[in-house]
Design a protein with these regions (language model features):
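Gly/Ser-rich, low-complexity
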Residues: 2-9, 29-33, 41-162, 176-191, ...
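Short, low-complexity intrinsically disordered segments enriched in A/P/G/S/L with frequent Arg
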Residues: 18-19, 26-27, 33
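Membrane interface segments of multi-pass transport proteins and intramembrane proteases
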Residues: 150-155, 254-270, 370-378
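Mid-bilayer segments of alpha-helical transmembrane spans in multi-pass integral membrane proteins
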Residues: 164-176, 195-212, 232-244
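Generic multipass alpha-helical transmembrane bundles of integral membrane proteins
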Residues: 218, 222-339, 343, 347
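Helical hairpin unit composed of two closely spaced alpha helices linked by a short loop
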Residues: 334-375, 383
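Membrane-helix cytosolic exit motif
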Residues: 354-362, 366-370, 374, 389, ...
Length: 417
């Protein structure tokens, strides 16, 4: 009697029912693939600065064409916070295009970001550990009070002690909540200031490469991006997180009211609406950028064809000069675009790591509260962890939106090529 071979398509569930995708949830694979694809897209841009031969060749092109970085680029670097400028390599101020290119090449090395990540994580990890230790101490006291109040047998006294315990924990972390909201507000202010300074820089480089229509379109769309970042993120995230924190406190003090579902609904609607708006804006920018770049390229090629037809010798010389200039402009675009991405990451990393570690401290505190039998305090800490998850998603989505916009600026070819 022959045995049937196992196909390995799925796992058994119940009475022979098969679970597809090896027993795992397929959307999780899709999200992991999307994150990996975005990472590879960014690394493909950064890898352009890893080879010294390419840098030296483009340096010769810049010298031959007489090109330099726009003066607005230096103003963008000077407008960065002091703690960010201290992290920049020497020559990144934009005064010399060759030195700036070498500085961007230095920033594209993995060792640079590894050192920066270790430094920032070390600072923020100490704050998170102190917060977790403070929460554990308060939860231990709450557990002792819970044991004491159970011996009295009075429901009113038990509720009063539980109310005081939850209020004490909330009062202890209130200044941390205020500090994080202030840091998020400052991050959006700096991010918007950075991108506001990058708009004239990108517009100048677009015009230098012959992409006049693309310069006008890209600048207007980036202004819309800044409006969305200011109105939906900078001004709205703090009131939303304040409402979620208030609902979390009320839900932990009076669980019978049932405000947890309302807080979850507000958080999901806000993040979904923000993600939808940013997706539409990126789709609009990419489509308009492609169409305008194609129109500019067609116009430039037509002009070169006419000049080479009417005056063959002079036209051929002009075409060769234009190709040299276009190569230099494309290199300057890469330097400016990738340095802008690095500036965004330098602004993002401290805020993002601080939010993630603080959220982790609250979630671990919620687990400790459940172990010690502090149900109300555990609910409060768990809800606060969700609030920090909302802040983290808003900060990350806004940064990714501007990073993809700059990546599109780098990858679009100049019209003179």
């Amino acid at each position: 009697m022959m045995r049937k071979k196992r196909t390995g398509i799925g796992k058994k569930r119940g009475a022979g029912e098969l679970l597809p995708y090896g027993g795992r949830n397929p959307p999780r694979r899709i999200w992991c693939f999307a994150v990996l694809l975005l990472t590879l897209l960014l690394l493909s841009e950064f890898a352009a600065f890893a080879a010294d031969d390419g840098t030296e060749a483009q340096t010769g092109v810049l010298e031959e064409a007489g090109l330099s970085l726009p003066s607005e680029y230096g103003e963008v670097v000077q407008g960065l916070p002091d703690e960010v400028k201290e992290l920049l390599p020497e020559g990144a101020d934009g005064s010399d295009a060759d030195l700036t290119a070498k500085a961007v090449e230095r920033m594209s090395e993995p060792g640079y970001w590894k050192e920066l990540l270790v430094r920032v994580t070390g600072v923020e990890l100490g704050e998170a550990l102190r917060l977790f230790a403070r929460l554990c101490a308060l939860l231990a006291l709450s557990s002792v009070f819970a044991a004491v109040r159970s011996s009295f047998g009075s429901d009113s006294l038990s509720k009063a002690i539980g109310f005081c315990s939850t209020g004490a924990i909330f009062a202890a972390i209130l200044h941390i909540e205020y500090r994080q909201l202030e840091a998020v507000s400052l991050f959006f202010e700096r991010l918007n200031s950075l991108m506001l300074g990058m708009i004239p820089v990108t517009g100048t480089l677009w015009a230098m490469g012959g992409n006049v229509n693309t310069a006008a379109m890209s600048g207007s769309t980036l202004y819309v991006f800044l409006t969305v970042s200011e109105q939906l993120c900078a001004r709205l995230v703090i009131p939303v997180c304040g409402i979620l924190t208030t609902l979390a406190l009320c839900n932990s003090l009076s669980p019978e009211v049932g405000l947890r579902s309302l807080g979850n609904a507000i958080r999901k609607v806000y993040t979904f609406f923000l993600g939808l708006v940013m997706t539409l804006l990126l789709a609009l920018l990419s489509s308009q950028n492609t169409l305008c770049a194609a129109a500019d390229s067609t116009g430039a090629r037509t002009a070169k064809l006419v000049s080479s037809t009417i005056i063959p010798t002079v036209g051929g010389s002009v075409g060769e000069t234009l190709r040299t200039v276009a190569s230099g402009v494309q290199y300057l675009k890469s330097v400016v675009g990738i340095s802008g991405i690095f500036f965004i990451l330098l602004l993002l990393l401290p805020t993002l790591i601080s939010l993630l570690l603080t959220r982790l401290a609250f979630l671990l505190g919620s687990g400790v509260a459940e172990i010690l039998g502090c149900e109300g305090e555990g609910k409060l800490l768990g809800e606060l962890g969700s609030v920090y998850g909302c802040m983290t998603s808003v900060v990350a989505m806004t940064s990714v939106m501007f990073i993809l916009a700059l990546n599109l600026f780098v990858r679009t070819a100049t019209a003179l090529m």
